[in-house]
Structure formats: C-alpha cells, structure tokens
Amino acid sequence: MATIHVDGKEYEVNGADNLLEACLSLGLDIPYFCWHPALGSVGACRQCAVKQYQNAEDTRGRLVMSCMTPASDGTFISIDDEEAKQFRESVVEWLMTNHPHDCPVCEEGGNCHLQDMTVMTGHSFRRYRFTKRTHRNQDLGPFISHEMNRCIACYRCVRYYKDYADGTDLGVYGAHDNVYFGRPEDGTLESEFSGNLVEICPTGVFTDKTHSERYNRKWDMQFAPSICQQCSIGCNISPGERYGELRRIENRYNGTVNHYFLCDRGRFGYGYVNLKDRPRQPVQRRGDDFITLNAEQAMQGAADILRQSKKVIGIGSPRASVESNFALRELVGEENFYTGIAHGEQERLQLALKVLREGGIYTPALREIESYDAVLVLGEDVTQTGARVALAVRQAVKGKAREMAAAQKVADWQIAAILNIGQRAKHPLFVTNVDDTRLDDIAAWTYRAPVEDQARLGFAIAHALDNSAPAVDGIEPELQSKIDVIVQALAGAKKPLIISGTNTGSAEVIQAAANVAKALKGRGADVGITMIARSVNSMGLGIMGGGSLEEALTELETGRADAVVVLENDLHRHASATRVNAALAKAPLVMVVDHQRTAIMENAHLVLSAASFAESDGTVINNEGRAQRFFQVYDPAYYDSQTVMLESWRWLHSLHSTLLSREVDWTQLDHVIDAVVAKIPELAGIKDAAPDATFRIRGQKLAREPHRYSGRTAMRANISVHEPRQPQDIDTMFTFSMEGNNQPTAHRSQVPFAWAPGWNSPQAWNKFQDEVGGKLRFGDPGVRLFETSENSLDYFTSVPARFQPQDGKWRIAPYYHLFGSDELSQRAPVFQSRMPQPYIKLNPADAAKLGVNAGTRVSFSYDGNMVTLPVEISEGLTAGQVGLPMGMSGIAPVLAGAHLEDLKEAQQ
C-alpha cells in the first residue's frame, strides 16, 4: 500500500497502480480516453493530466499524465489545480477540432465516454471554424458499424483488437493528425471478439449494427441482469429492451467471470428472442389444425388428458433453467424424468462432473484462467465451443511477457514496456484437435489426430509425469519427443491448466485430461482443470440427473409410457429424427413447452408457449459449477394482452396443481428455489446465487429502467389511450420502472445497467468496483456449488487403441462453429451471413480415392435421407474420417463419432 495526497487529502492506495487507477478506485473523477483497465497505459491522449508536487511545501508543481505516473508512497497531486483543469479542457478542444458535432444522430449518444469526458472537463463552446478532415467509412460486416469521422485517435481499438484479442485484420494507417483505424479493405472483421470494439471505443466510431436497425437511446431501454444463454461459460450480460423487443446486449461486469469482454455469439446472437414465429399462446391440435387456448383452458385440457394416461414421462433440457427442469421432474416423478440428451453426451457430462467434484483438482473461474502459465487443451475446439475461455487462454499465454517485465521491476500497467520487453514471448500452449483450431496461432505445438489418438497422447503425458499412471504402448519416437517437450513445459510450470470438455465426443479424452491434472498435482503443481460443456445449463441438468433421451424414446416405443412432456428441447439435435418422430407418433399425448418453434411441434398435441430468458427468471449453472441467476427483462403481455407466455416452471407447476386439484403453491421464484433445495441438497447453493424477492435498498426495489426513461405513458397509445398499470414483479427484487434504487454505491451485486452521475458509458463500471478492474464492490454475483475435493480419483486406466481407418467406412469428426452450431443463436437473422455453408471435409488421400476435389458435391445416407454436401479438403484431418459442421442444416451434434459407409460423388 502507498499513501498519496490528493488536493490536500490523504488516501491509502495500491502502490502497484498508476495515479489514474488509484484515483478512480477512490471514486475521484479524472477524465481519460486511451487508458482502459484491461489494456494498460500508453499515454496517447494526454487527457488525464494532473499537477504533481515534489512535497507538501511545493506550490509550483508540474503537469504529469496520471496514467503514466506510479502511485508511489508520498506522492502529492492536485486534480482541481487550475492549470491542470485548463490543460484537460484544451485537450478535449483539440480533439474536437475534427470531431463532428453530430451527437443528436450518433448512436453512441447517451452512452458515450467522449460526451462524459467533454462535460467533465467543462468544454462547452467550439472555437474552431475551419475545415474538418473527413474519412471514408468501411463495411465491417453485419455486427459493427464504422464511422471514422468520429475518431479521436485514442488507439484503444487496435490495442484491444491486435494486442489483446490477437486479431490481425484491423490496423492503423496514416500519420500525424490524419490516421485511419480500419481494415486494409472493406470486409467482415474476422475476430470472434470484434463486438467488444463497441464498448472499447470511447466514441461512436464502432457501434452495434444489430441495434441500429431498431435503435433506442440507452436511457429509453429497460434492462435486467442476465446470463448469456449461448454456451456453457455463463458470461454476465445486460440485455436492453424497448417495445417488447430486445434491442441490444451489453457486457455486464463480473470480476470473477467475463469482466469487460464477451464473444460475438453472446453479444449479437439474441435475435431468436425477437422472431415473429415464436409460440405466443397455448395451442391444441384439432385434426390437422391447432386452436388457440387461454391459460386456464390449456391447463384444464392437459390435466384431463394426463389423468387418462397410464404413464407420463418428462424430457428435460440443458438449455432450460434449473427451476424449469425441476418443475418437470416434480410433475412426472423423479423416476420418469429424462435429461433430453443422448446417452454418450450424458455419459461424458457425468464424467466431467465427477472429475470436477471428486478429482481433487481446482477448477478456475473464467478470469482466473488468465493467470496460468502453461496450458494443455485436449480435444476441445475452445474458440468455437466456449469462446470466452479462448480469449482468457490468450491472456494466459501473454503472461510470459508480464513475468519478464516484472523481473525488471516494470509495473503491470506499463503495457508498451511489457510488449517491448516480451518481444512476443509466450507461456507454452499445447492444443490437440481433429483439425486446425483458432488457437493454433499462439500454440507452441498442435496435434491433429482422431480422438482416440488425442486421448492416447494425454494418457502418455500423464504417465511421463507419473509412472504410476497407466502406460501407453506403441508411441512413435517422433511423437514421444513432442510428449517430452510437453511434459517438460507442464512440469516446469507453477500453475499449469488442463482444458477439455464434452464436445470432443470422447470420454477417454476427458479421462486423459483428468490423469494429466492428477499427475501434475502429485508433483506439487498448483494445477487447474477446466471442462467445457455444451449448453448453458448442462452442468445443472447433470447434477439433477435422470435417464438419457434414448431411454425415454424406448419408453414411448414400447408403449410403457403413453404421454410425454418435452421441455425446451429440439430432440432432433440429440437423437435420430426418424426415431424421435416414430416414438412421438406412438404417444397419445405429446406436450411441448418451448419458446422457439421446433420440428417436434409437428408431433405435438398441445404446445405451451414458454418465455425466453429475456422474459423469465431462473438459475443456470456454468461449466465451473457456478450457479447464476438471470432476471426477466420485460413482460411481453404488457405490449400485447393476447400474449400468454409464462416461465416453463410456471406452466408445469400450474399443470401439476391442476392435475392434483390443489391450489398453486409456487407463486413466485423463491418458492421453486426452496423446493429445489429441499429435494436436491447438492443444489442448495442456488439460493445464494442472488437475493430473494424481499430484498430492498432503503425500502426500495431496484429499478430496471434508467431514471431518464421516457415515453412510458405513450408507448401503447397506438393500442389504447388508457395506460395500463406497469407489470408487477413478484418474483424478484426488481421493478419494471424507473422508480426504484439505481445508486452505484448501493449494497448490491445484481446491476441491470452501468450508470453513475457523470458516467453514462460502460466506463461507469468503475463506480461499481472495489478497485478499478477488480471485483464488484459488494461481491461478484453467483456462487460456486462445489469446491475442490480433499480426496482425488484414481487414475483412469482405459487407454484406447490407436485409430485405424477402414476401407469404405468413414468416422464423423465433429467441427463446431461459433456462428451456427448453437441451437438458439443460429436462429438469429444477423447470424445467417456469418454461418458457413454446410460442407463435408475430407483428407486429400480420401478425396483422391473417391475421385473428388474441393467443391465437388458428395452424398451419403443418414437417418433414411440422402444428404448432399460440397467437399472441402483439409490436410489436418486424418484419413478415414470426414468432418461435418455440428448443429447446422440438419447435422445433429449426436452424429459425432458415427460412421458413414456409402459416401460417393453425387449424381448431377
């Protein structure tokens, strides 16, 4: 710690910080542009000037840039010194000489750091009367709009994109006061994390193009704390709504999880919530048509049918909340509850859970991954299946340069010096996969092989680290030399990290990862293990347990069950569509509860219109076992009284109560959570994931809307001049109103949107943190359900045999895509242009045998249908395998590991 003196007052601060960080952490306001907590200091903008004095007697002082000055013990500075204030105002005026005066039409208006800093410095009058330099804007793809004339040359964008996210297609061109930030030519930004430019940029150069089409000012949107639903990582988000539509998603700061950044799937993949074809009312089949029901009719009709059924089974979902899956389990009984995922996937999920719960290896939170100094990724294409983890791995690899700089006593915020000292030095990263991955550019070595051979590599590494681990026979000398390099790197690391997951299609790969981690722990290393699952609540569903989807289908096929309730699950993604359709056709009652129109609704007798994550409350559990709560952003019925969309748990409990002819006793979310905790002790922690509905701050609920929210009385005037009462939230501590507490200093961790007096942009998160870039002042939201076990598992011993290609037979290797493989985000219209066209990948040798080239269309039969796809050639894919894009164009993820036998060139 260090003692500094600011404008005559004494403060205790972190001596490792610079003065800007220290003052912002104290709650003092210093304007800045080029500095960012995640990017460090470069002193490019000169906006953060303060007056520094030699001692208490010095009255003259000198101007220094606070972001480039350490917060040393005994420092004396003044923020309010007149010369410093005039200098800061002059800097803004210089920046404004070329900045357009277009705030009223700029999409950043009201959410703009430049506006905030201009007001903070007191600059309010323009004296420049000459020609402004102008630029041509670029088309940067479907996600981001580009308006270069607003640029103030702070260099944040290229520092984030190139130095932090390792992007290669955005740069700075020109010199002096005529520099251009963009691509060499028009085109879509290639980085999976390009959307963060929207919040990194302090002006309106980079803005959210998906928001542009249905634009609202930040102060006119309703927000709620939420969790990204597009993968298993559980990033925190702030969805914004207006007129019953999601308009944008912003990053919600969580110092333990995603801190300042999201991936593009999480930021832009919300379009499925706004689709017009979503089920909005319950419907029941009458012959070939569906008739619309109200809620009471739906419940009574369903109950009447279920009473006549001899056995009702329930099929849950990894994309439904803990509460909804539990409500289904209560409706049908624990013995009749099925997870809705394939047997193989469920087996891998349970194995991953076993490793996390009983393996005795620490599971780091997302942000902690950045602190590891050697990483082994076994089998998982992390950028496509858990992209935010990939960004964290990139920071872990860069830790080598920080170590080198620290050895020379260079502060952590001196980023230019760190990059200069490091000269691209990296901590070791080793990646195995069936083919190339997006992490290969920073990897020390990559191994492209079938999953069996990847598992064998992992087992061999574990044995080399600890000879009591099972040995692997038949390792080639060349591969053994690589294993020796990996072993040396992992054994020499202080904090090695092993990453694997369930998307590999191989339980043996997960076992190999666990063995490596156990062997490293036995050597005294502070080892961590990260498992990536498939869906937002896969871990929660795994903890809850239940039979596999195949078992559920067998119940229907044999007639043992004659009614089925399917919860938020497109079963065609988890099993053969032919088998699913045949099994559902045998059931006299098929009830579907979902917020998306899926293929299985064609077999449904009753459809209950569920609410999406934006219209409901619930709990999900991420890949590290962290329970996190998402909150309802808006009530769709407020805009359309004909809409009947309820949380799935509310539908199912209401049906259960109707079936038993009793009163509904789960009238709010807390009641469901209490029931979950009572029945499933391992989920007891979900009660602490967020405060209950009685939580108040000074007697007030928390506001979902900024206090400047406008137009509420006129929003429905086109429907009726009579303004209805605002929706009443009985489930949570939030209110659908601007009336309520929204103070940044209030004792809360669940923050709907970032705002503080004088801070309207995302930089306002500074005001909510215990120290800038640290944790939220009153703790990061969420709670870990299981900590590191004191015990450890025995070594897994089932070393697989080496993969052997078979003539006339090809094994399907899974290829995942950030844009396209996820069930929900692939429905977003804006994603269509980013999704690759369906393909089949072949090794050159296999392509030669078949007599096909790149672009040739080949066909194969699957599930009774003939599939025709264009060929792509890949040198990395091992012969005897074909690669298919999982989750796209009818290519169900369950296909991973299956075999094709009739692959041939398609008839023209």
Curated annotation (Swiss-Prot):
Top class in the EC scheme: translocase
Specify the 4Fe-4S Mo/W bis-MGD-type domain's residue ranges.
221-277
Molecular function terms from GO = 2 iron, 2 sulfur cluster binding; 4 iron, 4 sulfur cluster binding; metal ion binding; molybdopterin cofactor binding; NADH dehydrogenase (ubiquinone) activity; quinone binding
Report the superkingdom from the record: Bacteria
Q: Which GO terms describe its biological process?
A: ATP synthesis coupled electron transport
UniProt: [4Fe-4S] cluster 1 binding residues: 99, 103, 106, 112
Entry-linked Pfam families: Fer2_4, Fer4_Nqo3, Molybdop_Fe4S4, Molybdopterin, Molydop_binding, NADH-G_4Fe-4S_3
Q: What is its EC number?
A: 7.1.1.-
Family statement: Belongs to the complex I 75 kDa subunit family.
NCBIfam families named in the record: NuoG (TIGR01973)
Role? NDH-1 shuttles electrons from NADH, via FMN and iron-sulfur (Fe-S) centers, to quinones in the respiratory chain. The immediate electron acceptor for the enzyme in this species is believed to be ubiquinone. Couples the redox reaction to proton translocation (for every two electrons transferred, four hydrogen ions are translocated across the cytoplasmic membrane), and thus conserves the redox energy in a proton gradient.
Q: What's the protein called, per UniProt?
A: NADH-quinone oxidoreductase subunit G
Which species is this UniProt entry from?
A: Escherichia coli O6:H1 (strain CFT073 / ATCC 700928 / UPEC)
**Protein's gene:** nuoG
